[in-house]
């Protein structure tokens, strides 16, 4: 059964508005957790800035874009629940984590994170010498709060790192409760909101929130953001500190120093403004609604098991193969034969937890129940068509 509000006027209005703001889709896009479709406004803003660079020079154009970029920073701070955060643009989420951990103060380097931590994040943590301690979890991968409280109080790490929604599974972590726990224990909380910003509520005032432009906010690729509580920012020690002969730079300025694609940052800032204009709460509700519909229509597709509970408040649906279905072959068939864009997620996404590859879909608010019905039918065909390729 579909959720009763699946085709509600409010949902249709948001879907229509989102769809009209973008170029027509070439096929069926169910891959926003990888990269959403940009709007005309974001595309035009980036292009106009690039043209302005050609007209007046890159540095003059960057100065002219300062107000737009400041608005983008303010939007990120608001969506993180930390209005006074110092916000640094990066090239993506992984770059943001690299900047943060490479600048972390003190000699002690321990952090607690989920067993399902994103593989590349684990690589960055190891590169910066952090000892990783797994947080206790429930069967569905959600943090076990009571057990985590005992663990963190008994042997506090230097920081807690929480990926609010994983790359390999659409379970939303209880972020607000973890934030409260970390506040009570006086532990810095770092939130990986790559899959969270614009998708689930991240406004909990964590000490650090970092995210990507290209996913649920639907901005350009190659841009990310690092938002840090001012008190913590002052404690960070940039890997490349400003030399004595340079003018004084704040820590945030040191972290953000270097070459940048300002046009992409402008596009990201515009996309953030569009997200706020559409209403973050309405977007979150619509995304959760689509996740509910997807899991319902896919529950009985032979050869696959839906990983998330039907009412999980996220738009991501993960399909684990059973009876020998091949996620990589199915993903390729869906793209080549039906122009349906999905994600094949290998075990490297979560090397400490994911036992086998999975198939992931992630609709945005412009997708419909009919789209998800069409995907279910195509999945049946793809599974049958690729069954002999094993």
UniProtKB/Swiss-Prot annotation:
Record field: catalytic activity: S-(hercyn-2-yl)-L-cysteine S-oxide + AH2 + H(+) = ergothioneine + pyruvate + A + NH4(+)
InterPro entries reported in the protein's UniProt record: Aminotrans_V_dom (IPR000192), EgtE (IPR027563), PyrdxlP-dep_Trfase (IPR015424), PyrdxlP-dep_Trfase_major (IPR015421), PyrdxlP-dep_Trfase_small (IPR015422)
Pathway named in the protein's UniProt entry: Amino-acid biosynthesis; ergothioneine biosynthesis
GO MF term list: hercynylcysteine sulfoxide lyase activity (ergothioneine-forming)
Required co-factors: pyridoxal 5'-phosphate
Catalytic activity, EC: 4.4.-.-
Protein keywords: Lyase, Pyridoxal phosphate
One annotated GO biological process: ergothioneine biosynthesis from histidine via gamma-glutamyl-hercynylcysteine sulfoxide
UniProt superkingdom: Bacteria
Pfam assignment, any one: Aminotran_5
Function text: Probably catalyzes the conversion of hercynylcysteine sulfoxide to ergothioneine. Ergothioneine is an antioxidant that protects mycobacteria from oxidative stress.
NCBIfam families hit by this protein: egtE_PLP_lyase (TIGR04343)
Recorded family membership: Belongs to the class-V pyridoxal-phosphate-dependent aminotransferase family. EgtE subfamily.
Name used for this protein in its record: Probable hercynylcysteine sulfoxide lyase
């Amino acid at each position: 059964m579909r959720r009763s509000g699946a085709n509600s006027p409010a949902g249709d209005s948001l879907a229509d508005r989102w769809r009209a703001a973008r170029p027509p889709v070439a096929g069926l896009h169910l891959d926003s957790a990888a990269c959403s479709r940009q709007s005309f406004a974001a595309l035009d803003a980036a292009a106009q800035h690039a043209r302005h660079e050609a007209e007046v020079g890159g540095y003059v154009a960057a100065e002219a874009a300062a107000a737009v970029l400041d608005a983008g920073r303010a939007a990120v701070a608001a969506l993180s629940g930390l209005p006074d955060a110092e916000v640094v643009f990066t090239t993506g989420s992984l770059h943001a984590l690299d900047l943060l951990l490479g600048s972390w103060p003190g000699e002690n380097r321990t952090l607690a994170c989920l067993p399902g931590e994103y593989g590349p994040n684990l690589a960055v943590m190891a590169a910066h010498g952090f000892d990783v301690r797994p947080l206790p979890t429930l069967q569905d991968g959600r943090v076990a709060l009571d057990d985590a409280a005992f663990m963190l109080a008994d042997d506090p790490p230097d920081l807690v790192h929480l990926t609010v929604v994983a790359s390999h599974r659409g379970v939303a972590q209880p972020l607000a409760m973890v934030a409260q726990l970390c506040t009570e224990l006086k532990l810095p909380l770092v939130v990986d909101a790559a899959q969270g910003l614009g998708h689930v509520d991240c406004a909990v005032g964590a000490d650090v929130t970092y995210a990507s432009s290209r996913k649920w906010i639907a901005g350009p690729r190659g841009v990310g953001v690092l938002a840090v509580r001012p008190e913590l920012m002052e404690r960070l020690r940039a890997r490349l500190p400003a030399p004595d002969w340079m003018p004084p730079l704040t820590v945030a300025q040191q972290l953000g120093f270097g070459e940048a694609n300002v046009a992409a940052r402008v596009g990201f800032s515009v996309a953030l403004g569009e997200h706020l204009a559409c209403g973050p709460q309405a977007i979150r509700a619509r995304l959760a609604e689509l996740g509910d519909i997807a899991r319902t229509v896919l529950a009985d597709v032979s050869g696959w098991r839906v990983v998330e509970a039907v009412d999980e408040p996220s738009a991501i649906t993960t399909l684990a193969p059973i009876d020998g279905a091949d996620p990589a072959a199915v993903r390729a068939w869906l793209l080549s034969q039906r122009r349906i864009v999905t994600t094949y997620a290998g075990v490297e996404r979560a090397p400490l937890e994911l036992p086998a590859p999975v198939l992931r879909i992630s609709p945005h608010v412009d997708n419909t129940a009919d789209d998800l019905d069409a995907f279910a039918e195509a999945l049946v065909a793809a599974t049958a068509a690729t069954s002999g390729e094993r």
